């Protein structure tokens, strides 16, 4: 009988889970609603434990990094194109645009807006003596959570306008699409 040496695995152990994790990360990057997890965290700040608030920010930041990674990976072909006598390549402009846009639309503006709503609601309910203390405690949370869907489009539009009048003018970059609620990776 012919004895063959045992065949070794073609895939190294360190890369065994890379494929499924990559598919999971790509699916996560297409889930735009994950970028609003920090809004939920901000709305519940002071009412829920800080670990919950911090974990919601971690979800948002993770989404942003995963989305930017796949934008980077899917658009490397732009790195050789230079336009508008700029020192930046089209790829650098593209990545800069999306990084700054996410910083505004997913973190900065929602945090300020939700924090203002929570503070204003707390201040308003503090002066109403006949309200149940539990209502006073949870009214800011409920109102903030209820307003999150109403804030998405105006905040995205504000970030678009700011980018149009600052970054796009400065770098001569024109984004191809502004459908931020759809995944950039589905095309």
Curated annotation (Swiss-Prot):
Q: Which domain of life is it from?
A: Viruses
Instruction: Name a Pfam family for this protein.
Output: MTP18
Q: What does the entry give for GO biological process?
A: mitochondrial fission
**Listed name of the protein:** Uncharacterized protein R740
The organism named in the record is Acanthamoeba polyphaga mimivirus
């Amino acid at each position: 009988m012919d004895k063959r040496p045992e065949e070794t695995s073609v895939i190294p152990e360190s890369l065994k889970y890379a494929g499924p994790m990559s598919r999971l990360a790509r699916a996560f990057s297409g889930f735009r609603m994950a970028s609003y997890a920090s809004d939920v965290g901000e709305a519940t700040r002071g009412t829920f434990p800080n670990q919950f608030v911090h974990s919601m920010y971690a979800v948002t930041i993770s989404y942003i990094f995963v989305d930017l990674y796949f934008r980077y990976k899917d658009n490397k072909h732009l790195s050789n194109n230079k336009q508008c006598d700029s020192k930046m390549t089209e790829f650098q402009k593209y990545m800069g645009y999306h990084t700054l846009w996410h910083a505004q639309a997913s973190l900065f503006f929602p945090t300020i807006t939700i924090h203002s709503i929570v503070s204003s609601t707390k201040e308003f309910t503090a002066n109403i003596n006949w309200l149940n203390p539990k209502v006073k405690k949870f009214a800011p949370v409920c109102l903030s959570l209820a307003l999150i869907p109403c804030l998405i489009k105006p905040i995205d539009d504000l970030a678009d306008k700011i980018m149009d009048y600052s970054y796009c003018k400065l770098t001569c970059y024109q984004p191809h699409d502004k459908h931020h609620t759809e995944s950039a990776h589905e095309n």
